[in-house]
From Swiss-Prot:
Keywords: Cell junction, Cell projection, Coiled coil, Cytoplasm, Endocytosis, Endosome, Lipid-binding, Membrane, Phosphoprotein, SH3 domain. One of its GO terms (molecular function) is identical protein binding. Gene3D superfamilies: Arfaptin homology (AH) domain/BAR domain, SH3 Domains. Implicated in endocytosis. May recruit other proteins to membranes with high curvature. This is Endophilin-A2. InterPro entries: AH/BAR_dom_sf, BAR_dom, Endophilin_A_SH3, Endophilin_SH3RF, SH3-like_dom_sf, SH3_domain. The keyword Transcription does not apply. It is a peripheral membrane protein. It holds the Pfam family BAR.
Length: 368
């Protein structure tokens, strides 16, 4: 920084201290300017909080949001184009219903109904994904651009104005000790910054109809989502009512137990009056330590080398997103990387993926 720049910084700091500590009066801005500054400040706070709440409305599960952010970061590092989407609760419910509906089979009324409901829930999840995309494009992104560009630019102008005001007030207080030309230049710069800040704030407040249009786009997207959701649910309700009517009109099947097979008692002329008994085998020294000629085969798992980082699965883990590694309790997994404090990356049966740290017990830790 040049000597002139250092002097200017000293002037501003000295004036600020005299105002904060000594109670010196600085140049007052007019009421119209203060009113605009207050409105811009309220607008900035409103936009910032509305953005946060909108994201929470679309993606209410904070754990899923954090996990999605982590997976997207990993995908960018790996250069993957397709990123996993937010796991909609309707989609998770639909997959659960479809899975159990298939297990019950087509002969079960409940199983068929679960299949119908599950497919409808999955359609609702797709509609919800479309809502997320539309709201992001037409509401979240424009407001984020407003924060990053217009509001940030206004804050820059206001900060510059405050610095030039302090410089002008310091020189005005020492009028006669500094050249008049230097004081005049300080005043011109202060008035120039004030005009630029006023213009930028005025333009923002006068064009707030753009924010109204963006809010309207949010409501339109919600209306479209709810219309489609109502249509899907009405179709599902009709299907289920039709199944109830068909099941009620169908004659009930009577349960007929299978006839018992005759039980042969065999030879009843036993000395003790009971059932015939097989003679007990003789126990010898060699036979007491073996139950059969064939050795018992114990289940085995392919273990990674003892010097290779590895872990053992404590529970079953079902992958819900692309890039996750599923396993069963007792599986031995080769560790390749630790993503963060909650997630590992590893390999099992030739497949690589991510899995939660809490599901496994580390046998050989990763090198530090």
């Amino acid at each position: 920084m040049s000597v002139a720049g250092l002097k200017k910084q000293f002037y501003k700091a000295s004036q600020l201290v005299s105002e904060k500590v000594g109670g010196a009066e600085g140049t007052k801005l007019d009421d119209d300017f203060k009113d605009m500054e207050k409105k811009v400040d309220v607008t900035s706070k409103a936009v910032a909080e509305v953005l946060v709440r909108t994201i929470e409305y679309l993606q209410p599960n904070p754990a899923s949001r954090a996990k999605l952010t982590m997976l997207n970061t990993v995908s960018k590092i790996r250069g993957q184009v397709k990123n996993p989407g937010y796991p909609q609760s309707e989609g998770l419910l639909g997959e659960c219903m479809v899975r159990h509906g298939k297990e019950l089979g087509g002969e079960s009324n409940f199983g068929d109904a679960l299949l119908d409901a599950g497919e409808s829930m999955k359609r609702l999840a797709e509609v919800k994904d479309s809502l997320d995309i539309e709201v992001k494009q037409n509401f979240i992104d424009p407001l984020q651009n407003l924060c990053d560009k217009d509001l940030k630019e206004i804050q820059h102008h206001l900060k510059k104005l405050e610095g030039r005001r302090l410089d002008f007030d310091y020189k005005k207080k020492r009028q006669g000790k500094i050249p008049d030309e230097e004081l005049r230049q300080a005043l011109e710069k202060f008035e120039e910054s004030k005009e630029v800040a006023e213009t930028s704030m005025h333009n923002l407040l006068e064009t707030d109809i753009e924010q109204v249009s963006q809010l309207s786009a949010l409501v339109d997207a919600q209306l479209d989502y709810h219309r489609q959701a109502v249509q899907i649910l009405e179709e599902l309700a009709d299907k289920l009512k039709r199944r109830v009517r068909e099941a009620s009109s169908r004659p009930k099947r009577e349960f007929k137990p299978r006839p018992r097979e005759p039980f042969e008692l065999g030879e009843l002329e036993q000395p003790n009056g009971g059932f015939p008994c097989a003679p007990a085998p003789k126990i010898t020294a060699s036979s007491s330590f073996r139950s059969s000629d064939k050795p018992i085969r114990m289940p085995s798992k392919s273990m990674p080398p003892l010097d290779q980082p590895s872990c053992k699965a404590l529970y079953d883990f079902e992958p819900e997103n692309d890039g996750e590694l599923g396993f069963r309790e007792g599986d031995l997994i080769t560790l390749t990387n630790q993503i963060d404090e909650n997630w590992y990356e590893g390999m099992l049966h030739g497949q690589s993926g991510f899995f939660p740290l809490s599901y496994v017990q580390v046998l050989v830790p990763l090198p530090q």
